[in-house]
């Protein structure tokens, strides 16, 4: 599905370059080269593609010290599981206040349809009894897909199911004590993406904008999440590519306050040098 051009299509150098770029973006080949050769007649071309295999598995381990204290992480990733281009990833993160782990499987070309299908399992345990006076444990399951609805317009629906247990200390504030209990959620989330980048792999021009929303289907403490993520790219010179990125999220409780674990904070990868949860 990464090849935009097919046998018998009118020749387009632009579409050939996009196809090669898509192959590089899959991150399962060490090198991808192509040649455009003359065909049996003047109006025919032969495209010869040469790929170099590489190890598609990755193991990552890390440790750090920052404004949130000490953190450790370990991840295993496979970009070509079973030789079918399926992405398999598992990750464990440990900080002073939270332990989280997840495993996800993403088939970017499910049943040769060109549509992506993914499934994920997330488990986390948070202990903030020494600061805000609560601790929580959460187990969640996600199932979703992503496909190109119109040219350069992608739709990504998903279903999230989660169970969470929140315990509150007796010394916590009255506002936090109201959040104690067991919660079961079933949410419907979707994203609409407009992708006008010149290429998926190392873009040099264009933009990518995504609007995403989460709506409660079955939820003990209902809230609606809205977000916008935008990236633009511009090539100032052959060796200098500039980018501008905008990210915003908001969450609104429907009938009561937003649950403690659902409240929003700026991700550390978006704003560095500050303590999270502040």
Q: Where do the model's predicted regions map?
A:
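Gram-negative/organellar outer-membrane beta-barrel architecture
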Residues: 4, 9-210, 223, 233-234, ...
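A penicillin-recognizing enzyme superfamily signal
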Residues: 227
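A generic structural motif
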Residues: 127, 215-219
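Short edge-strand/loop segments of extracellular domains
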Residues: 247-253
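Short, structured patches in soluble enzyme cores that scaffold and shape functional sites
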Residues: 213-215, 248
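Electropositive nucleic-acid-contacting surfaces
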Residues: 239-244, 256-263
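Charged catalytic cores and adjacent phosphate/nucleic-acid-binding surfaces used
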Residues: 230, 246
